[in-house]
């Protein structure tokens, strides 16, 4: 079992964020010893999933719905799969967008390195299509 401070350090997540998650019901089976939250392996695994879903842009209310589905059991497998399929598609689209941006950044690095070596952009203007 881990304290909220230990979990905060392990995941590099502020204690206030963990408290917020708890307040929002994202840790339905979180044990308490008095006023001290005790995180077990199940909560750590759930936190990994929560952070993953957050990184894909899912809102807390929708993450809460996922947590509720897990609590409901196997009857929600199809809905959970659908959630992750949608997250996968969104993440793949975001990766593609970032890859295009990275390609442009790499091109501009090359472009300005070449312009610097050449002492200007004249040669580049002749070999590169308009619009770049």
Description of each model-found segment:
Residues 1-67:
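Basic helix-turn-helix/winged-helix DNA-binding cores
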Residues 55-87:
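Amphipathic alpha-helical dimerization/coiled-coil segments
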